[in-house]
Design a protein with these regions (language model features):
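Conserved, well-structured core domains of diverse proteins
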Residues: 1-94, 98, 103-114, 121-122, ...
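Alpha/beta enzyme core
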Residues: 114, 135, 149-241
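General beta-strand structural signal in soluble alpha/beta enzymes
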Residues: 123-126, 143, 165, 234
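Charged, often glycine-rich, active-site loop that binds/positions anionic groups
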Residues: 139-145
């Protein structure tokens, strides 16, 4: 017996992988000739992550503590000691990743900055540049350099505590970004130098380097721009380089 998927499509066989929703999505994409513009992560049914999902790597040859319950365990993490004159120090080995003003509201960006301070972590600007309030509220702020370069400002770059050169991310490896016109408000359009009410489409690759050799040159350029003061990270999704 066939399963009804939509008014226009019939699913003849159902499996654990190709559910009615996935089959319908494939059919709609084929009909449109492009991807569907909609929210995925917030709409799909997903199990919330718990501490059970964390895997701690054991140190099997480390000295065994004589009184483990009394000895202090430090989670302090220092990044950038190899090249940067001013490394960053975090109280915990967890960082808040880049989420742009536009994808998130102004209040959400400021709240993330304050929350990062409370737990001793760092905050990241995301696409579209740096908010002044975000800089003021962040003890440790990472400036994200993306392929789009929307809102890029060399002065904001120098005001950051670290730089993140984004090659890709796990949420959308190998693809660019899209900020719908409904979110490109007057203030956001001004900061990103975009026409008001027009979709912002971000490319998947940087315009000024093509491969790993060129990327090294870009990193050196960023080091010179910041006088070798701050750490520089490279962010990429778990993909083939």
């Amino acid at each position: 017996m066939s399963t009804q998927v939509s008014p226009n499509y019939q699913l003849l066989r159902q499996s654990d992988i190709f559910t009615p929703e996935i089959i319908e999505d494939i059919q709609v994409k084929a009909e449109l000739g492009r991807y569907r513009i909609r929210g995925y992560g917030t709409l799909r049914e997903r199990r919330w992550s718990t501490f059970d999902d964390l895997t701690f790597i054991p140190c099997t040859l480390t000295r065994i503590p004589l009184e483990g319950y009394r000895e202090r365990c430090s989670s302090t993490t220092i990044l950038g000691t190899r090249f940067a004159n001013t490394p960053i120090q975090l109280d915990i080995p967890i960082m808040i990743t880049g989420m742009s003003w536009g994808a998130l509201s102004y209040n959400a960006k400021v709240a993330l900055a304050k929350g990062a301070n409370i737990v001793g972590s760092s905050n990241t600007t995301g696409d579209g540049g740096m908010l002044q309030a975000e800089r003021e509220q962040s003890k440790t702020l990472i400036y994200e350099v993306l392929p789009s370069r929307y809102g890029f400002d060399i002065h904001d770059l120098k005001a950051a505590d670290a730089i993140e050169l984004t090659i890709g991310q796990g949420a959308k490896p190998g693809t660019g970004g899209l900020l719908l016109d409904s979110k490109v408000l007057d203030t956001i359009a001004k900061q990103r130098d975009l026409p008001l009410g027009v979709d912002q489409r971000s490319p998947a690759r940087h315009p000024d380097f093509l491969g790993p050799d060129d990327m090294i040159i870009k990193i050196e350029e960023l080091r010179e721009a910041t006088d070798w003061e701050v750490p520089i990270f490279v962010k990429m999704g778990a993909t083939r380089v």
